[in-house]
Structures are given as structure tokens and as C-alpha cells.
């Protein structure tokens, strides 16, 4: 399964961003992991890399939170009776990713991968609102990250 990704760079500084292939690999791993328990067809999604101003605006508009955030997920809502391979949109804020990676003392690639996987799982219907959901989602993220050769992103919390 190779997802079709519309990668949009809306950040003033695009240096140091992961490649389209890296994003595709990370999404593919999340989808492949999920496909073991469900039937996911060929999937299309948009990944938009933004600056803090756009992240802040979207976070305020859609979540009522007056600050920028690292990743926003907007699942595509398919009308009943229509089958489309559209999964949704991920909005990832470049500056927040860089700040968090520095604060957490992790590689940029690891943090980009984690947030891409985290957002993709949200598009697949996972959430972390309650403790049980959070444990399930974080467990999946940890497994996928380790399959990709990265450290468990929640290791410090365990």
C-alpha cells in the first residue's frame, strides 16, 4: 500500500524539512499497521507544512485553542454511499516541531516521524481523550516508531 500524498509547503523556510518520500514512508507504516486489523484501500491525504501563524489560526478556528500547535488532523468526511480513498488533511507546524525536538532532545527526523504517525492515526479514528484511548494510541505510535528504527517517543513518560 503506497499512500498518495499531496505535500504542501506553506512555511517561509522549507530548509531541513523531511522529503516527500520520508512522509510517505511514515504514513505507509501507520496505514500498514492499521491494515492488519481493517481493510484500508489505496489512500490519499494532504500534508501541509505551515508556520505558527497559520497553525494558530486553524487551532483557534477549529479547536477553540488560542495558540499554535504541532499537528492538526482533519479527517475527510465521506458522504454515505460514496467510497473515496481520501483520508484527510494533516497540518504540521514547522516551528513547533523544531522547538519540541530541541526541548525533548530528540532528532528532528524522529519528531517529524512521530507527529506524522500521530496525525495519521487521528485520521484513522484514533484519539487520546480518555486514558484507555490514550494508552491504545500511544502503544501503536510506539510500535510503529520502533519498527521504523526510532526510539519509543513515550519512553521518558513510562
From Swiss-Prot:
Gene: ybeY
Keyword Endoplasmic reticulum assigned: no
Protein name: Endoribonuclease YbeY
Function of the molecule: Single strand-specific metallo-endoribonuclease involved in late-stage 70S ribosome quality control and in maturation of the 3' terminus of the 16S rRNA.
Cofactor binding note from Swiss-Prot or TrEMBL: Binds 1 zinc ion.
EC identifiers of the protein: 3.1.-.-
Keywords in alphabetical order: Cytoplasm, Endonuclease, Hydrolase, Metal-binding, Nuclease, Ribosome biogenesis, rRNA processing, Zinc
Required cofactor(s): Zn(2+)
Single GO term (MF): RNA endonuclease activity
